[in-house]
Amino acid sequence: MLASNLNDGASILHERMEQVKEEYSDAEWKNDVVGTDEDIEPINDFEIEEGTDLYLVEVPVKEPWKVFAYISFGDWNECPKAEEHMAIAKYWYEKHGACAAYISNDVVEYYLPSSVMGDTMPIAEEHLGYSADILQGNNLASLSSQLKKSTIWYFWWD
């Protein structure tokens, strides 16, 4: 898996986003998915439930995206395959400095050295492509705004 082609993280996200978008009419997409900013709280701490057993693992990699080659994660329901996680993680690391820092049975959380600035709607759309489950109860406008204030990116899959 370490020899996988990792130059396609952006295309994987784009393709997954288009698949999500196909599930909605234009009106549903605009009103329900994009929506309006509801000013949700930033995420600057890991979302770990109290009482959860944690294991600190030192993974022998120089590039942080390669952690997915050692910790097999994904390939169920809508969760990307481990190779796709690795390509996406490389893309986000190179573009935003994001590193996968917490992986559980159904959650991946990325740490960023600082929140992202500028137009964050394209990043929110990438997040939706990565994990369509993240919008439950929210919308892209709110997620886009949240990204400007957050140093943790939270993703989960059913």
Q: Where would I find each of the regions flagged by the language model?
A:
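Extended, low-hydrophobicity segments enriched in charged/polar residues
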Residues: 1-66
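Structural alpha-beta junctions
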Residues: 94-97, 133
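Generic structural hydrophobic/aromatic packing signal, biased to beta-strands
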Residues: 56-58, 92, 127, 155
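Alpha-helical oligomerization segments
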Residues: 106-158
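Short beta-strand
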Residues: 99-104
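Short glycine-/aliphatic-rich beta-strand segments at the starts of folded cytosolic domains
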Residues: 60-78
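Short amphipathic alpha-helix segments
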Residues: 79-94
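Intrinsic-disorder-associated interaction segments
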Residues: 6, 10-13, 78-82, 120
